Amino acid sequence: MTRTDNAAKKVILVVEDLPFDAEFTLQALEKFEGSVDVDVARDGWDALVLMKQRHFDLILMDLKMPRMDGFETMILMRGYQLQHEVPLIILTNSDLEADRERARQLGAVDYVHKSGDLARFRSALQATVEKHMRV
């Protein structure tokens, strides 16, 4: 799903299997409306397909997904050198330090917890996007 289409904009890939969480993330990105183009993949497999077709400036990825989870996706994208220099931020409900550490080892540059509080999530995600993308 492409939210907008403009070649001059920064391009973000959101990888999220749950429609509610994907919409939650898109709402948090509304602050950047007009300066970003957002594609959504429903799992790691779909994300890899999109990564072969288009360059992204930032990737926001859930860890727990069907077909191919975030960890497996990171392993394959780095192995195939897909978007290997693109900042990848993990968005997850997991509080496990082991998940955070493994994500870092696989190349994630940041880790944002998806809380049920939209304002808190929005604030954390917006700050992280600004930090890594300069929008």
Model regions and ranges:
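Acidic, metal-coordinating helix/loop segments flanking the phosphotransfer/catalytic sites
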Residues: 40-58, 122
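Active-site residues of response regulator receiver
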Residues: 62, 92
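Short, glycine/charged-rich "phosphate-handling" switch motifs in NTP-dependent
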Residues: 109
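His-Asp phosphorelay/catalytic-motif detector in bacterial-type signaling
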Residues: 55-58, 82-87
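Receiver (REC) domain active-site loop signature in two-component systems and cognate sites
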Residues: 65-68
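C-terminal output helix
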Residues: 116-126
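Conserved acidic segment of CheY-like receiver
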Residues: 9-20, 25-29
